[in-house]
């Protein structure tokens, strides 16, 4: 179902339900469409908040995992969110890790689904073929447990992003940042209760 995207204090976000705050951080593609099922379920128990991350709005120097993490911190401060249950998917999981390491005082629990931040598999078995729609469709379908999740609308979105020169450059910047920003040596500093969700096998970089 479509959700109202609010625009306050220069932040765009979805907010549904009541209760303790559950903040969802999306990956590179899909944003709200990837979280519809989660929003619908958790809004019955939590105040579910999904900030729209400025993945393609930041300048190239700040198109990094750290740059997105700073945005998330500003968002939580602006909304005065405390004791947050933070859930991050893929690149959003990496951003969540960086945030909780720098600002643990605001986070009550951490959930990571297919998070980047430990090991990156490059671009899989080949480089992205920007003009090949079928290639992009197949790679997008591989991102999900159920390939049907990759609707034509989502594939069209990914195809459009990949074929936009400026956005493609920022994707590369984010991907390189994720590879450089390995957090393996810092994970023992996280004291919040943490749930890890990971597929048995993956052939994709954990950014989507």
Pin down the residues of each PLM region:
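N-terminal cap/lid segment of alpha/beta-hydrolase-fold proteins
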Residues: 1-10
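Conserved loop-alpha-helix segment in the C-terminal half of the alpha/beta-hydrolase fold
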Residues: 38-42, 189-208
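Flexible "cap/lid" loop of the alpha/beta hydrolase fold
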Residues: 94-138
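Structural signature of beta-strand start/N-cap positions in the alpha/beta core
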Residues: 21, 47, 82-85, 106-109, ...
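Conserved HGGG/HGGXW glycine-rich cap/lid loop of the alpha/beta-hydrolase fold
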Residues: 9-58
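Active-site loop/oxyanion-hole signature of alpha/beta-hydrolase fold enzymes
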Residues: 14, 40, 49-87
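Conserved alpha/beta-hydrolase "nucleophile elbow" surrounding the catalytic nucleophile
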Residues: 26-28, 84, 88-93
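Conserved alpha/beta-hydrolase catalytic His-Asp/Glu region
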Residues: 130-192
């Amino acid at each position: 179902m479509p959700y109202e995207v609010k625009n306050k204090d220069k932040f765009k976000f979805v907010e549904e339900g009541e209760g303790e705050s559950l903040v969802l951080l999306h990956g590179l593609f899909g944003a709200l469409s990837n979280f519809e099922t989660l929003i619908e379920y958790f809004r019955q128990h939590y105040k579910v908040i999904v900030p729209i991350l400025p993945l393609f709005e930041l300048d190239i120097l700040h198109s990094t995992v750290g740059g997105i993490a700073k945005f998330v911190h500003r968002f939580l401060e602006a909304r005065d969110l405390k004791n947050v249950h933070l859930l991050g998917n893929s690149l959003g999981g990496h951003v969540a890790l960086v945030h909780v390491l720098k600002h643990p005082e605001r986070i009550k629990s951490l959930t990571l689904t297919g998070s980047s931040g430990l090991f990156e598999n490059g671009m899989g078995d080949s480089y992205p073929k920007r003009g090949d729609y079928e290639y992009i469709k197949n790679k997008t379908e591989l991102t999900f447990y159920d390939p049907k999740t990759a609707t034509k609308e989502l594939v069209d979105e990914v195809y459009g992003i990949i074929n936009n020169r400026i956005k493609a450059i920022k994707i590369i910047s984010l991907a390189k940042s994720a590879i450089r920003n390995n957090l393996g040596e810092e994970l023992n500093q996280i004291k919040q209760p943490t749930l890890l969700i990971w597929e048995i096998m993956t052939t994709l970089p954990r950014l989507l």
